[in-house]
């Protein structure tokens, strides 16, 4: 079992890739069960992470996201799987010319592909809240993704890449 701060990177974001490529190959956007067409590729990448890790494979379950970031910052690791929000921390050590975000190779012609995005986390509104609080929450979420100040805060202050055409362009290289 992975430490909870790393769990999402390898079992969620990384696992999105074989599912994405299978959906693309089959021309679908939903299914009751995947066929597993690209699961060998997922296993190969996961195995590579274990065999070429900065520590013994038996120690990986205790490693945290902070450990992973620090190993990258200290030059112990060449690659660091994470998201655009890590730019703030990494830019304290590295210049933009020293950083890049690259797709994870999954054995398909993906030279024009973008980067993996986690869709497992959604914004939620508590239906048990007061109508006033529900409306305030909805207004705030709308402000975050439609207003200049909101999208600027999300892209610059929080480091998120916002997939809306009206959003501010992120200032980080990721």
Regions found by a protein language model. Name each.
Residues 1-31, 77:
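Extracytoplasmic/periplasmic solute-binding protein
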Residues 54, 92-158:
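Extracytoplasmic/periplasmic substrate-recognition and gating elements
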Residues 74-82, 97:
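Alpha-to-beta junction loops
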Residues 154-174:
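Long, aromatic- and glycine/proline-rich binding clefts that accommodate carbohydrate-like moieties
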Residues 12, 87-93:
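Pocket-flanking alpha-helical
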Residues 65, 82-87, 119-121:
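Beta->alpha turn/N-cap motifs
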Residues 59-74:
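Short helix-initiation/N-cap motifs at beta->coil->alpha
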Residues 30-61:
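Glycine-centered hinge/linker elements that transmit conformational signals in sensory
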